[in-house]
């Protein structure tokens, strides 16, 4: 009983929260449904007080009723029902509707009036009751309850009936009788309904439970798993659930049933077959999944997707993996004969079959006439004959002057189960000792931005004439990307090359004896470059010399006049914005130094026919007009996407000159991390500037859109690209002045390129990038600008380095706004007080230290861009250093870092003070654990000690050892 009560208590909350399935009632007797006399037994029968009558119920239906109003209250008056079969119920409910007269409303003769009656029951296996049996008394009858009225009738009052429901039981025999006994009550029995409650059939938790009669407080019912489900785990016990005595299911079921493979759960009570094109591989509550690529199902309720014809799964593939197919044949087999050694090379199949486990096998056939047999076992293959992962095999041990057929087969993981022969390509080779002499004298005849004309010296042949030549070329440094061209003459034209790029070229000759060796690689570049053809070298030298003399004279006169006119109002030569040309170095030329700015446009930007351009959509707006995406199709060249800046109508000459100045600037730069100028359109309206199209847009918005999606090494790669572009600009003596993440563009390969050179001279103010107006005029983006540029408009490459440090912070914070919501004046004040931005979350300590180096107050102390590129390269080569992050203060926001000068080393009284003084406090715990707990221990530390402690960065080792040397020199003044 205690266990049952515990189950009931435990299930109470579950019943309330999940809702109850209504109990089902089975009626054993209902007098309201009787249409004839009830023929109940009345006692005493000689002078019966109970009287059967016809009446109307509350709905106006005719019903049979009994009423009694005895004058003598000393006599008991009984009324007994007919035999009622119990139908297996262990207890029943009796619903009684009756009225009762109030005793005070009765005449005085009813002095012993009562306002209650008693209900009894008697059990029997047969209908044996009579007028005298059983005896009309409490025993053998069992008393159920004394029933009192809630509403009493009085003369002239409201007529209201009473409804009472009582429970009768326990019942054990086939049926029972109900008996009503009154003694002095004046009442009417309007209706009697006898029923019992049972738990209805229900499905829960993928288990089906039958209709259940409760025989006790709770009755355990056994169920079965619903259709298309089965028990999970090792248990085979059927599901169970408890049925309460009130006909309600109690608590959740105990069930391990779950949907079978090929079926998914629906509403937690049934399993539905997976549709065509879907599958489910295991028993459980997971949903059906779409079939992997190249597979399908043939019927609903599938547990596995079958591969489409021609596709297979390897024995090592998982059952739910995509189906793949064997690869297509290898392409372009190239061979080289050296005596009796053959080297085979080939290109990758066009179709890898959807797999990465591609390998190759080489078959050799020895042919004499029309008869071919397998090659001898003495032939060797390097690196192997079967399952070769690469695309090059060297075959040794061949016979001279013999014809061989070599077949290269492409295979992958499903080739063995495909029951088809691997795709292959074959080549016939005849060995000979009389091979062609190597080619020499390779030279460039003519070059353009996308093509090169090459010729070479015809090699002398002693026995066989040269049939043709084979040339191979690739970008310099990419030895695995060779492309091949054949030529019958000693020259060839290579097209579709990258501009301003260096290529390595090799040539070999073929005779009747086969191909000779490739020549040594020769480096040849496309335009623009600084080379001149030999035929024009002398003329070019003379013209250059004359031009330099004239230019030097003009520059001297211009500088003299300029300094004379500006000496009083501008004593600092850096403020003029002019850039002097270096010795033998290509430098930037300011287009505003031209008397006619249009001449600068013609010199540095290529004019493009407007018919070559197709504008597709507007992607933004700039200072001068709209920015669009379009296509550029120059005849003879591949169509490319371009970004198009347009000059809005109604412009002034100055606006047109300022708009095109950016093209004059951009056209001077050729670098993979500088936005590339395709050309300009000035001969028609609107005037346009065309640049390469960068799919991912501005870096700041791209990072915010992909917050947290990139690893530190990827972010460092982006920063390295930006630094490389700025290194190129600084070497060109160009100062950007507005370096920020919003002015860095990102292409589909995550390559970052510096852009927006017009803003280096014309900065506008807007709500997202507020600027500060200096006393000298002009707008400056405060948050990105070095303090000397804010105060004195002193823009140099060092001020660009400061801005680059802010860009680093933007990148590592995924586009966070520098200095958050601080005002411009607060930013200026904080920088003047030597406060700097803290490291972004999860920022490697080495990167934040590089930021702090870029934010040195003295511009001469900041690193150059070449040093920044080298530092980032070291981090990329040592990814482990990016796992060390700085300590970030707790709290809702990160305060600015105090970068004021540390105290002198002589004031350091502990190891912790010393490490903080040299900004190496990150190693404090490591020093303590290694036993360096006092200053006197530090003076004897070595490089080996630092490695043992965990200081692996060369820069940190150098900084610590340098400080240790200082401690040794000033050891006498240290306080221990």
Swiss-Prot record:
Domain Fibronectin type-III: 326-434, 438-529
Biological process annotations from GO: ephrin receptor signaling pathway; Kupffer's vesicle development; somitogenesis
SAM domain location: 906-970
Binding annotation for ATP: 619-627, 645
Location of the active site: 738
Record membrane topology: Single-pass type I membrane protein
Membrane-side (Extracellular) residue stretches: 24-541
Family annotation (Gene3D superfamilies): ephrin a2 ectodomain, Galactose-binding domain-like, Immunoglobulins, Phosphorylase Kinase, domain 1, Transcription Factor, Ets-1, Transferase(Phosphotransferase) domain 1, Tumor Necrosis Factor Receptor, subunit A, domain 2
CDD domains: FN3, PTKc_EphR_B
Signal peptide: 1-23
Sequence ranges assigned to domain Protein kinase in this UniProt record: 613-897
Domain of life: Eukaryota
Cystine pairs: 69-186, 103-113
Cytoplasmic side: 563-976
Catalyzed reaction equations: L-tyrosyl-[protein] + ATP = O-phospho-L-tyrosyl-[protein] + ADP + H(+)
Family: Belongs to the protein kinase superfamily. Tyr protein kinase family. Ephrin receptor subfamily.
Record-given protein name: Ephrin type-B receptor 4b
Source taxonomy: Eukaryota, Metazoa, Chordata, Craniata, Vertebrata
């Amino acid at each position: 009983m205690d266990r049952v009560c515990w189950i009931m208590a435990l299930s109470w909350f579950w019943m309330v929260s999940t809702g109850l399935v209504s109990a089902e009632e089975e009626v054993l007797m209902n007098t309201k449904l009787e249409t004839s006399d009830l023929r109940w037994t009345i006692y005493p029968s000689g002078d019966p007080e109970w009287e059967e009558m016809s009446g109307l119920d509350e709905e106006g239906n005719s019903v049979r009723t009994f009423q009694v109003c005895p004058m003598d209250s000393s006599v008991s008056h009984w009324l007994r029902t007919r035999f009622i079969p119990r139908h297996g119920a262990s207890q029943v409910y009796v619903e009684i509707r009756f009225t009762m007269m109030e005793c005070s409303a009765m005449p005085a003769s009813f002095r012993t009036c009562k306002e209650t009656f008693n209900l009894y029951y008697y059990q029997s296996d047969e209908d044996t009751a009579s007028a005298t049996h059983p005896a009309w008394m409490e025993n053998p009858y069992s008393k159920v309850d004394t029933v009192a009225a809630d509403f009493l009738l009085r003369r002239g009052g409201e007529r209201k009936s009473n409804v009472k429901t009582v429970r009768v039981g326990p019942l054990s025999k086939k049926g029972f009788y109900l008996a009503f006994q009154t003694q002095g009550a004046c009442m009417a029995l309007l209706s009697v309904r006898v029923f019992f409650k049972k738990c209805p059939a229900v499905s829960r938790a993928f288990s089906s439970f039958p209709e259940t009669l409760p025989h006790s407080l709770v009755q355990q019912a056994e169920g079965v798993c619903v259709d298309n489900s089965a028990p999970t785990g090792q248990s085979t016990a059927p599901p169970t659930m408890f049925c309460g005595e009130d006909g309600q299911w109690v608590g959740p079921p105990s069930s391990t049933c779950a949907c079978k493979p090929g079926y998914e759960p629906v509403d937690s009570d049934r399993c539905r077959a997976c549709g065509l094109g879907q599958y489910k591989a295991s028993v459980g509550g997971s949903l059906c999944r779409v079939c992997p690529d190249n597979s399908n199902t043939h019927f609903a309720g599938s547990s596995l997707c079958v591969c489409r014809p021609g596709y297979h799964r390897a024995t090592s593939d998982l059952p739910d993996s995509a189906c793949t197919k064997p690869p297509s044949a290898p392409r372009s087999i190239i061979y080289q004969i050296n005596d009796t050694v053959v080297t085979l090379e080939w290109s990758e199949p066009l179709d890898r079959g959807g797999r990465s486990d591609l390998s190759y096998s080489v078959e050799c056939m020895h042919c004499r006439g029309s008869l071919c047999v397998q090659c001898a076992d003495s032939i060797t293959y390097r690196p192997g004959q079967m399952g070769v992962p690469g695309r090059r095999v060297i075959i040794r041990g061949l016979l001279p002057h013999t014809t061989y057929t070599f077949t290269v087969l492409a295979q992958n993981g499903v080739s063995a189960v495909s029951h088809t022969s691997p795709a292959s390509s074959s080549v016939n080779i005849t060995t000979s000792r009389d091979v062609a002499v190597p080619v020499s004298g390779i030279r460039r005849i003519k070059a353009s931005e996308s093509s090169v004309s090459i010729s070479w010296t015809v090699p002398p042949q002693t026995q066989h004439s040269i049939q043709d030549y084979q040339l191979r070329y690739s970008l310099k440094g990419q030895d695995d990307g060779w492309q091949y061209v054949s030529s019958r003459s000693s020259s060839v034209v290579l097209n579709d090359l990258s501009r301003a790029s260096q290529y390595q070229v090799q040539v070999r000759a073929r005779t009747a004896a086969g191909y000779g060796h490739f020549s040594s690689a020769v480096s040849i570049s496309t335009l623009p470059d600084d080379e001149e053809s030999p035929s024009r070298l002398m003329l070019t030298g003379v013209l250059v010399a004359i031009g330099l003399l004239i230019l030097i004279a003009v520059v001297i006169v211009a500088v003299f006049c300029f300094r004379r006119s500006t000496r009083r109002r501008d004593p600092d030569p850096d403020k003029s914005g002019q850039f002097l040309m270096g010795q033998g170095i290509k430098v930037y030329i300011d287009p505003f130094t031209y008397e006619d700015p249009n001449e600068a446009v013609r010199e540095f930007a290529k004019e493009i026919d407007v018919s070559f351009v197709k504008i597709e959509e507007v992607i933004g707006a700039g200072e001068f007009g709209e920015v669009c995406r379009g296509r550029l199709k120059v005849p003879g060249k591949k169509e490319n996407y371009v970004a198009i800046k347009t000059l809005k109508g109604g412009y002034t000459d100055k606006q047109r000159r300022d708009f095109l100045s950016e093209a004059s600037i951009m056209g001077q730069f050729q670098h993979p991390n500088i936005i590339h100028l395709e050309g300009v359109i000035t001969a028609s309206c609107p005037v346009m500037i065309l640049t390469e199209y960068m799919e991912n847009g501005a870096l700041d918005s791209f990072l915010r859109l992909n917050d947290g999606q990139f690893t530190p090494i990827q972010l460092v790669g982006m920063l390295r690209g930006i630094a490389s572009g700025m290194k190129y600009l600084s070497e060109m003596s160009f100062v950007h002045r507005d370096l920020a993440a919003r002015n860095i563009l990102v292409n589909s390969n995550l390559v970052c390129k510096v852009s927006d050179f017009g803003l280096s001279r014309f900065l506008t103010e807007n709500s997202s990038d507020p600027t500060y107006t200096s006393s000298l005029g002009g707008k400056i983006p405060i948050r990105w600008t070095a303090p000397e540029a804010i105060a004195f408009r002193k823009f140099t490459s060092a001020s660009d380095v400061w801005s680059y440090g802010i860009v680093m912070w933007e990148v590592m914070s995924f586009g966070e706004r520098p200095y958050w919501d601080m005002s411009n004046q607060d930013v200026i004040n904080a920088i003047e007080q030597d406060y700097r931005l803290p490291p972004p979350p999860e920022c490697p300590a080495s990167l934040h230290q590089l930021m702090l180096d870029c934010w040195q107050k003295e511009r001469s102390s900041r690193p150059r861009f070449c040093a920044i590129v080298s530092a980032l390269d070291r981090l990329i080569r040592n990814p482990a250093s990016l796992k060390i992050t700085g300590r970030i203060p707790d709290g809702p926001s990160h305060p600015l870092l105090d970068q004021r000068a540390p105290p002198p080393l002589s004031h350091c009284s502990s190891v912790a003070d010393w490490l903080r003084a040299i900004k190496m406090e990150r190693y404090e715990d490591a020093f303590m654990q290694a036993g360096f707990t006092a200053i006197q221990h530090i003076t004897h530390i070595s490089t080996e000690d630092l490695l043992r402690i965990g200081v692996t960065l060369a820069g940190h080792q150098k900084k610590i050892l340098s400080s240790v040397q200082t401690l040794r020199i000033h050891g006498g003044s240290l306080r221990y």
